[in-house]
Amino acid sequence: MTQAHVLRDRAVYEERSTTRSRTIWTRPVDPALDVELVHEWMHEPEVVKYWDMAWPVERIAAYLADHDADPYRANYLTFVDDTPVGYLEVYDPAHDVLAAHYPVEPGDVGAHVLIGDKDFRGRYSVSLGLATNRFLFQRPGAVRIVGEPDVRNHNLLSLLVFLGFHKAGELDLPEKRAALMLCDRADFERLSSGPRRRRQLQASEG
C-alpha cells in the first residue's frame, strides 16, 4: 500500500468510535501529497466498478487540483487512528450537474464517499458512515445530505438506508443510473440516538 502522509495537525473533524475504541478523523486532501494514495484506491476492483476513475496518476493529480481550486467542492481523507481508510468528496449541489436532475434546497450538501482500504470495508462501514454524516452536518447551514450512488451498488444503498437516508427516486446522470438518496438532519439525529438504536449500531459491527 502507498505510504500515506498522516498530517494529524490538519484534522477538521474527529470522534472516538464507541464500537471500535479507535479514533476516526478527517482532513482535507493535499493534492500533491495524497495523489498516489487516491490513485491506488481508484484502481481497487470494488472502486473501479462504481467510480470508473482508474486513470493514470497524472490525470488523478489534475482532477484533485481542479477540485482544490473549486470553491464549491472539497475533498477529504478519512483515517482510523493513523491509517487512511477513505476518500470523501463534498460539493454544493446547486453548482453541480445534479442541479438539473432534482430540486435543490437550501442547506443541501452533496457527497461522494468510498472506503479505499479493503480491510475496513464491511466491519467499519457503519462507524465510518456515522462519522461522515456527523462531519457533514457540522458544516454551516447543512440541513440535508444528498447522495447519488450507482443503482447497482446494493451494499452502499443498504448502508445508506441504515444510516438514515431514504431513496427519493432514480436519475439518469451522464455517467450512470443513480439512486437519489437523501438524509435530513432531523431524521439522522433521531435515528442515531437512543439506547435501542445504539444497540443496533453496535450489533451491526459486532
Predicted regions and their residues:
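Acetyl-CoA-dependent GNAT
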Residues: 69-108, 114-120
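Conserved N-terminal entry element of GNAT/NAT acetyltransferase domains
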Residues: 1-32, 189-206
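Conserved GNAT acetyl-CoA-binding A-motif
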Residues: 138-149
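Helix-loop element at the rim of GNAT/NAT acetyltransferase active sites that forms part
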Residues: 40-54
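Conserved catalytic-core motifs of GNAT/GCN5-like acyltransferases
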Residues: 92-94, 148, 166-180
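Conserved active-site alpha-helix within GNAT-family acetyltransferase domains
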Residues: 151-169
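Conserved acetyl-CoA-binding loop-helix of GNAT-fold acetyltransferases
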Residues: 122-138, 158, 162
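Active-site rim helix/loop that mediates acceptor-substrate recognition in acyltransferases
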Residues: 54-75
